[in-house]
From Swiss-Prot:
It comes from the Bacteria. The active site is at R20, N38. Residues 5-92 form the Acylphosphatase-like domain. The gene is acyP. Keywords: Hydrolase. Pfam families: Acylphosphatase. The lineage of its organism: Bacteria, Pseudomonadati, Pseudomonadota, Gammaproteobacteria, Enterobacterales. Its EC number is 3.6.1.7. The keyword Hydrolase applies. InterPro entries: Acylphosphatase, Acylphosphatase-like_dom, Acylphosphatase-like_dom_sf, Acylphosphatase_bac, Acylphosphatase_CS. It comes from Photorhabdus laumondii subsp. laumondii (strain DSM 15139 / CIP 105565 / TT01). Belongs to the acylphosphatase family. HAMAP family: Acylphosphatase_entero. One of its GO terms (molecular function) is acylphosphatase activity. The keyword Disulfide bond does not apply. This is Acylphosphatase.
Length: 92
């Protein structure tokens, strides 16, 4: 399996609504590695590694609104180098 990396910045009502935890659960279920963290501007950063199908599924999940309780106004994504991370974690 060829691994790819993507960095996604998510904007909207994405802090204080369980977004990081739900993203963590979703990523674990879909066997992605990487991390999710809150940013000081109120957005959330997701760095995810997986095959192209896994990453496309993540993007589709965000397009569909992501976790319940969140309101995604928009998000941007770009490719990134793959790091050797064995799991998906929530960074604080």
């Amino acid at each position: 399996m060829i691994k790819y990396g993507v960095t996604i910045y998510v904007y909207g009502r994405v802090q204080g609504v369980g977004f990081r935890y739900q993203t963590f659960r979703w990523a674990k279920l879909n066997r992605l590695t990487g991390y999710v963290c809150n940013l000081h501007d109120g957005s959330v950063k997701i760095v995810a590694y997986g095959d192209s199908e896994q990453l496309n599924t993540l993007t589709h999940w965000l397009e569909q609104g992501g976790p319940p309780g969140a309101r995604i106004d928009n998000f941007s994504s770009q490719s990134c180098a793959v790091e050797d991370i064995a799991d998906f974690i929530v960074r604080h």
